[in-house]
């Protein structure tokens, strides 16, 4: 079941030529298109389904610096500023509010890791506070659990996934971006060894630069052009509750439940580090690369072989551009939610917060997260194909840092001074044989 999502209209006419084509209408692609157009570039955004239809509307809606890997902290910090700027520019509410993020733990070892992280973050201008049990009780007087400590970052925020990407798309369109939904990119044409056009199901767009922000579909698109991009797919579950008392105005994370206050008075609810790994021929191909990641996360993961496994074997990784592509057979990935996770999270939430005893699950949904082996995204040119750029593999972090990731991608595409140092996000690290392991601290 797909979660609620504000829908936008498409531009009917496909341009014959633009400066940049952006493939993918999630938060990253829309943000990149917005920043490219603001710099005066002509931009067409093509999306096989509808804007925000996949993970950008299925995530938790957290916009956080807290707990980010060192490599992502600069991007997360810039993203919060850009959320405000882009929301104001759009003139449409994306639901962004700076309401803080709070983590709680029952583990002394985990608390110690948070203290170490807070010290590193402080050096990078992110100010988080380690909380004592007494301070937690003061913040959450109705919570009946016993905690050894917490971590709070008041400058962090939240946004509404159902509203955010459509709002950003409205801002992008205001600056001249054309948006084409139900328009799958089938592949790239090249001239003289560099990108010269994008072939879509509705026609060809000539261009000298293409940014692929295709999320779970990015690896398959790259393989069609002989480009290696190790991406694993994890199906995750979230839900929304009926309205209830405001036990937090922002986001709260524990081992037993994670919540975000919604504008409708309910909560977005989920369990962290839980999901189902979708086994695929590509994942077996990259099994050695992903092995350290699997060992790190295996306690929260299930393994599944679905019909897509066999479909990929039959389909292969090559197709003709004059016939329907794999991207046209599944317009929107809509995995079923794991209701055992939903029920466990709700039971834990109510047990720890009795004042929420009357809330119920209003809706649950699944989504597919595109994960890299080190859980750091790829925002980078592809050296093997000049004119081709990637902004993908956000590993469940993309929504919150989306505005800054899009800005960085736009900077890289145009050769501008980058928003932050892009070295950590290089495509090269994915294919040069180095050992990749998760760097997210918690």
Residue ranges and their predicted role:
Residues 134-138, 304-314, 319-397, 427-431:
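Flavin (FAD/FMN) cofactor-binding core of flavoprotein oxidoreductases
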Residues 74-77, 103-113, 151-170, 180, ...:
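Short beta-strand to alpha-helix junction loop
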Residues 31, 188-316, 328-339, 344-355, ...:
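Flavin-dependent oxidoreductases
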Residues 61-139, 256-259, 266-279, 283-304:
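Dinucleotide-binding Rossmann-like beta1-alpha1 core, especially the glycine-rich loop
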Residues 151-209:
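Helical element adjacent to the flavin cofactor pocket in flavoenzyme catalytic cores
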Residues 37-57:
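Glycine-rich FAD pyrophosphate-binding loop
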Residues 2-18, 39, 130, 365, ...:
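C-terminal lid/capping helical subdomain adjacent to the catalytic/cofactor pocket in oxidative enzymes
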Residues 12-28, 44:
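Beta1/beta-strand and adjacent pyrophosphate-binding region of the FAD-binding site
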């Amino acid at each position: 079941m797909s979660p609620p999502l504000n829908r936008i209209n498409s531009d009917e006419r496909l341009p014959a030529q633009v400066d940049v084509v952006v493939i993918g209408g999630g938060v990253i692609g829309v943000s990149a298109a917005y920043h490219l157009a603001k710099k005066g570039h002509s931009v067409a955004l093509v999306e096989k389904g509808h804007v925000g239809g996949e993970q950008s509307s299925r995530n938790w809606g957290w916009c956080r610096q807290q707990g980010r890997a060192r490599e992502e902290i600069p991007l997360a910090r810039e993203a919060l500023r850009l959320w405000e700027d882009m929301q104001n520019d759009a003139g449409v509410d994306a639901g962004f509010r700076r309401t803080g993020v709070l983590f709680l733990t029952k583990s002394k070892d985990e608390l110690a890791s948070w203290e170490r992280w807070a010290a590193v973050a402080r050096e990078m201008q992110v100010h988080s506070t380690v909380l004592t049990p007494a301070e937690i009780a003061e913040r959450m007087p109705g919570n009946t659990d016993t905690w050894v400590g917490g971590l709070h970052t008041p400058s962090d925020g939240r946004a509404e996934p159902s509203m955010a990407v459509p709002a950003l798309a409205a801002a992008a369109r205001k600056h001249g971006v054309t948006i084409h939904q139900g328009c799958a990119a089938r592949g790239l044409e090249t001239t003289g060894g560099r990108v010269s056009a994008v072939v879509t199901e509705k026609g060809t767009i000539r261009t000298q630069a293409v940014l692929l922000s295709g999320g779970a579909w990015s690896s398959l698109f790259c393989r069609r052009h002989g480009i290696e991009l190790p991406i694993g797919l994890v199906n995750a579950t979230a839900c929304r509750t009926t309205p209830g008392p405001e036990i937090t105005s922002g986001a709260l994370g524990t081992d037993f439940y994670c919540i975000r206050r919604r504008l409708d008075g309910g909560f977005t609810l989920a369990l962290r580090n839980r999901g189902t790994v979708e086994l695929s021929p590509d994942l077996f191909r990259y099994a050695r690369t992903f092995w350290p990641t699997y060992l790190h996360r295996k306690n929260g993961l299930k393994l599944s072989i679905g019909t897509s496994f066999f479909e990929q074997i039959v389909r292969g990784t090559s197709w003709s551009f004059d016939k329907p592509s794999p991207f046209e057979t599944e317009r929107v990935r809509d995995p079923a939610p794991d209701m055992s996770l939903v029920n466990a999270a709700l039971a834990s939430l109510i047990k720890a917060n009795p004042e929420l005893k009357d809330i119920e699950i209003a809706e649950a949904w699944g989504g597919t997260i595109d994960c890299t082996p080190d859980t750091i995204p790829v925002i980078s040119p592809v050296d093997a194909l000049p004119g081709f750029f990637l902004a993908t593999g956000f590993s469940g972090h993309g929504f919150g840092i989306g505005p800054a990731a899009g800005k960085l991608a736009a900077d890289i595409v145009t050769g501008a001074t980058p928003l932050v140092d892009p070295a950590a996000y290089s495509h090269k690290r994915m294919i040069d044989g180095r050992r990749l392991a998760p760097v997210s601290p918690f």
